């Protein structure tokens, strides 16, 4: 069974043919995803992708097995202060982000990110995070691409 492909890469191209045709997103690693024009998020995605392409920042993209984009989120540089502690439960690990008013969370389905987050606590180097806005769940994390100057928010 095919699974959703998740990529966190810089944008190399966004094609918007206009009319009622779907757009196409191209990422640095060669991934291409269809941007469904009928999707109510289409115009928001175009703005996110345009800004990311200009800045060189990676984006978080989840594509269905057929290649259609399901989720596109901007990534932001953040400094991780603590992994675990207050707010941690059996289902999710609390993550304290510098200057964030709320606790963020890492769930079991993204547990593989924990070592990267813990390393960032030790080094105090910023990570690029993709966060689900409604739940504050950390969906993706990576180190900034080589040569990209990032300022944590």
Regions found by a protein language model. Name each.
Residues 1-153:
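Short, flexible, surface-exposed loop segments at domain boundaries
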């Amino acid at each position: 069974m095919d699974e959703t492909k998740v990529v966190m890469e810089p944008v190399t191209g966004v094609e918007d043919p206009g009319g009622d045709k779907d757009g196409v997103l191209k990422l640095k690693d060669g991934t291409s995803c269809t941007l469904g024009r009928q999707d109510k998020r289409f115009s928001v995605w175009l703005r996110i992708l345009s800004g990311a392409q200009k800045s060189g920042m990676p984006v978080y993209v989840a594509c269905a097995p057929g290649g259609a984009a399901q989720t596109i989120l901007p990534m932001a540089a953040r400094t991780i202060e603590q992994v675990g502690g207050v707010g941690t439960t059996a289902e999710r690990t609390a993550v304290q982000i510098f200057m964030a008013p709320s606790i963020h969370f890492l769930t079991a389905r993204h547990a593989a990110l924990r070592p990267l987050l813990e390393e960032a606590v030790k080094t105090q180097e910023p990570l690029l995070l993709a966060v689900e806005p409604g739940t504050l769940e950390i969906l993706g994390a990576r180190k900034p691409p080589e040569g990209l100057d990032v300022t944590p928010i």
